[in-house]
Structures are given as C-alpha cells and as structure tokens.
C-alpha cells in the first residue's frame, strides 16, 4: 500500500502517510493530507 505525502489525496482518514491526517474530506470527495 502506498501512502500519500503531505498535500496528497486521501479519503476519510485513509491513505495518508504516518503522522499525517486527512483534512477537508467530505462525503464522496477526497481531502488532502496535512
């Protein structure tokens, strides 16, 4: 599994690298890792 770096796409807290959290994700829309 490849993780997303800061600023990368994510969905509901899934997909970010360690230490990052998903910001701005809404139902059906991807957020960005912060």
UniProtKB/Swiss-Prot annotation:
Alphabetized UniProt keyword annotations: Disulfide bond, Knottin, Secreted, Toxin
Domain of life: Eukaryota
Organism: Cyriopagopus schmidti
Cellular component GO terms held in the UniProt record: extracellular region
Keyword Iron-sulfur: no
Domain remark in the UniProt entry: The presence of a 'disulfide through disulfide knot' structurally defines this protein as a knottin.
Tissue distribution of the protein: Expressed by the venom gland.
Main location: secreted
Family of the protein in this entry: Belongs to the neurotoxin 14 (magi-1) family. 05 (ICK-7) subfamily.
Keyword Methyltransferase annotated: no
Gene Ontology molecular function: toxin activity
Protein name per its UniProtKB record: U4-theraphotoxin-Hs1a
The protein's role, per its UniProt record: Intracisternal injection paralyzes mice.
SS bonds (residue pairs): 3-17, 10-22, 16-33
Cellular compartment(s): Secreted
């Amino acid at each position: 599994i490849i993780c997303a770096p800061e600023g990368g796409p994510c969905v509901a807290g899934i997909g970010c690298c360690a230490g990052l959290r998903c910001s701005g994700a809404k139902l059906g829309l991807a957020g960005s890792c912060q």
